[in-house]
Amino acid sequence: MRMPFLSLGIGAAVLLGGSTVGQVVKPLPASPQLVEKGKQTYQLHCAPCHGAAGQGDGPAAYLLYPKPRNFVKAQYRLVSTWEQVPTDEDLFGAISRGMPGSAMPSWPSLPEEVRWGLVHYIKSLADHPLEYGQPTQPPAEGGTGTGVIEVPPEPVYDEATQQRAAELFVQGCAGCHGANGKGDGQTRQIDSDGYPTRPRDLTRGIYKGDPSPESVYRRIVAGLPGTPMPMSDWAPGADAWALTQYVLAMSSPRQRQRSEMLKFAIETPRVTKLPSHPDDGEWRTASPINLHLMPLWWRDDRIEEVTVRALHDGKELAVLLEWHDETHDHTALRPQDYRDAAAVQFALAPDPPFFGMGSPGQSVNIWMWKSDRQADLVAFQELEEAYPNMGIDSYPNTLRSPLEQPMRHALTLESDPSFVTGWGAGNIVSDPTRKNAAEDLQAQGQGTLKAHPRFDQEVVAEGVYQSNSYHVVFRRTFKPKGKEGVVLKPGATVPVAFAVWDGSHGDRDGKKSVTIWQELKLAP
């Protein structure tokens, strides 16, 4: 078995749940108790995307691409049978590993019993039984077999096999995946539901299903139902194995592992002095953890990882986020411009709600930093930055022209807050006296985001962009003033998740890249 590459920084880190690639699992038979347990878990963690009735129409579905699976239609992509129907093991594997290349996260941290309960509950939503026959081999003259596709022993991948595989790839795969496997062949495609789809770039190592050779073999033979990827015409055996080995050679195990969402324990040492700036030397005492990110609206050209460090002094927590970004999007002066941003999300209970901004009745506390808010604190961001040759009107009866303002809110500060609606109402964004690029927020699911009152805004954040990378520090006291913030204490373990926005790719609001829940372990 291949040992998975774990994306860690220097120092110790604990992987929770672990990778599921190639693991053999023992199915649990359905029972009323197990199905009920699956139903409860489904309503908490799955319904926000897949919908309460499993029709792929949950409240978060509009934010996601590819779209969530419709469990009622029961047309599954990852199958290992000639009938193109998933086995229980297929469904268990998809739940455990997630589906890289989509917003379907991995759930290896859920107990196996709970995941089997999900398998049986999801099957109960289908409008037809998921049935397949006893295993039989396809006839010698061609055609298909029945039941689970038998995988013969893997042969040696020698030069002759590689040449044969290259010929097969050109004949049957390059038309969609491109001559070099970059997904640049026939790109105008739709799935069975009428949604746009595109061929996989095989060189990036982003596999929806288990990338083990046996699983890839079965997908080459069975295809991906509901997509333009058909059941293969190649004879099972040598040709299918040659294609499997050829395709897997286009990417590395490290690439394939980096597309999986993994759960880590983020150790948070106790120090006497907390760093206040991203470049402070105290950060050397914190072990970096590289967390994998997934875009909710998937794109291959994505920010793959965010590196997290955390420290505390017994009274206050400091978190450092670092990620690579080729563009410094720190202004949003034009309608087509979007800013870069980052956020830290805390669950308020040990058993966290849905990782996508919480659930009704189960709040999450969000600390958010925005690059344009930080730029505003440094200098007045005027339209002339975007349009350097624009003409500007200046009127003698005004106190100052825009270019003569000593700071962004100079004119606003001379006004009565009663007549500046946002400021007067306590909107933290409209406050001209604001000296912080952070916002302390609360949410109970999609569409519920709100800011804490101005007097409860205690989170401080500062970001630096250098060498095509962001470095952002968040700080807040352990005990918040208000009742809605996360309460921290030495020795506690707190569920935490992270998000990054890339303005140059149109990220804004719910269009972002996120992690799954991690564990923040505060040293005593």
What are these regions (language model features)?
Residues 7-17:
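Bacterial N-terminal signal peptides
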Residues 325-332, 482-484:
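Short amphipathic, basic-aromatic surface patches that mediate peripheral association
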Residues 306-309, 459-465:
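Beta-strand-rich interaction surfaces with strong enrichment in secreted/lumenal proteins
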